[in-house]
């Protein structure tokens, strides 16, 4: 079974556009653009790599931009590094939704809603909860066919990422209301030590470090069942 994005890249060459987050954002009609193209409206934006098959929010950050202040600078790569893009910022819940194909339509069957430690760190979640989905897929996403599953991440009900694999499979057996506390290296979790602990999918810690591109290293999860 396909478990990682790099495996999906090889398995589904016809859908490689999904990994291009700028292309996906444009198809969804968002206000977005690549590095060197200045914004037109003042506001909050998410800045992140156009491609990130590793996941974990590498390089993603929130930034306020104003064309009258930052527009000219953006043309010369200030604020948006090479290989990155900008997109309008969406407030609201961050959800990870797993789908399975039924009668040629993707049907959601498991949803996790996450909370970040703060608005400036888009990697470090402090809690995930099994919830109901808040999403309607555009018709063209139903045309995608995978081995079995599709995972879609949203913020405020807006699609921000599509993965040609499952995303929540380690937690499928838990009911709505179950809370999951990510365990980050160097943080004291004494208050949760009485709860069941789930290790990361990969036992090797280095597989969650991105060769130094991640400063927050997840070790696993504590599960607080409903």
Where are these regions (language model features)?
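Active-site nucleotide/adenylate-binding loops and adjacent lid/helix of ATP-dependent enzymes
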Residues: 2-138
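ATP-dependent carboxylate activation and anion-phosphoryl transfer catalytic cores
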Residues: 55-56, 104-107, 115-121, 126-226
């Amino acid at each position: 079974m396909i478990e990682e994005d790099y495996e999906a890249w090889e398995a589904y060459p016809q859908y490689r556009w999904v990994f291009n987050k700028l292309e996906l954002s444009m198809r969804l009609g968002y206000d977005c653009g690549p590095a060197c193209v200045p914004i037109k409206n003042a506001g909050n934006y998410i800045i992140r790599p156009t491609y990130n098959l590793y996941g974990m929010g590498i390089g993603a950050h929130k930034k306020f931009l104003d064309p009258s202040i930052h527009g000219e600078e953006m043309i010369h790569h200030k604020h948006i590094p090479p290989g990155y893009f900008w997109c309008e910022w969406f407030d609201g819940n961050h959800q990870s939704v797993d789908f399975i194909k039924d009668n040629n339509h993707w049907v959601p069957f498991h949803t996790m809603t996450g909370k970040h430690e703060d608005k400036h760190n888009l990697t470090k979640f402090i809690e995930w909860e099994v919830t109901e989905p808040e999403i309607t897929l555009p018709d063209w996403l139903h045309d995608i066919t995978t081995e079995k599953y599709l995972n879609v991440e949203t913020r405020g009900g807006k699609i921000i990422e599509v993965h040609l694999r499952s995303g929540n499979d380690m937690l499928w057996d838990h009911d709505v209301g179950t809370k999951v506390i990510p365990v980050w290296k160097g943080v004291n979790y004494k208050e949760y030590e009485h709860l069941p602990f789930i290790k990361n999918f990969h036992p090797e810690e280095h597989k969650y470090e991105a060769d130094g591109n991640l400063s927050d290293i997840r070790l696993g999860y504590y599960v607080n069942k409903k």
